[in-house]
């Protein structure tokens, strides 16, 4: 009974994040905190009822931390090189919830998909003169799209990719 309610709320939060970042260029910290708290509570409940191992919870927590550090690094390096923020604070604040929600290796699939889709859309917008090269494009919608792809097909995509490496 808990899972459908959880996924419905997650879907609504992801839709709010998608639309607010797309329309206003911001992801409210309150929404990110609510999202993270909800995912953390859900994961702890899964562990308490034996539907998730403590090791998997730790791996998800490490995914959350690792993604956050990666995004902070990207923001700092683009600030140093280009003198602009490459990622907004809302994107960075969203990363722990996504890492905890997806865990490893789905988070890798989700972030890869977000960057690929975001790059394609960005190039298309510049190509069709809808945006200039120095204008920002909200990244939150692409993080949401990447997360949804990872939730639905992340395991299959990861298995396919690993199979290609062997």
What are these regions (language model features)?
Residues 89-90, 127-149:
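Interfacial loop-to-transmembrane junctions
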Residues 116-130:
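Transmembrane alpha-helical segments of integral membrane proteins
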């Amino acid at each position: 009974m808990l899972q459908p309610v959880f996924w419905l709320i997650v879907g609504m939060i992801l839709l709010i994040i998608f639309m607010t970042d797309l329309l206003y260029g911001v992801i409210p910290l309150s929404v990110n905190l609510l999202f993270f708290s909800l995912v953390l509570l859900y994961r702890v409940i899964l562990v308490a009822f034996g539907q998730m191992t403590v090791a998997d919870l730790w791996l998800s927590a490490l995914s959350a931390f690792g993604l956050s550090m990666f995004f902070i690094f990207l923001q700092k390096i683009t600030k140093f090189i280009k003198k602009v923020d490459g990622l907004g604070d809302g994107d960075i604040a969203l990363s722990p919830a996504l890492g905890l929600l997806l865990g490893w290796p789905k988070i890798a699939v989700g972030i890869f998909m977000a960057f690929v889709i975001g790059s394609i859309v960005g190039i298309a917008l510049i190509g069709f003169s809808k945006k200039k090269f120095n204008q920002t494009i909200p990244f939150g919608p692409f993080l949401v799209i990447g997360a949804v792809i990872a939730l639905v097909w992340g395991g299959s995509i990861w298995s396919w990719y690993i199979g290609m490496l062997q």
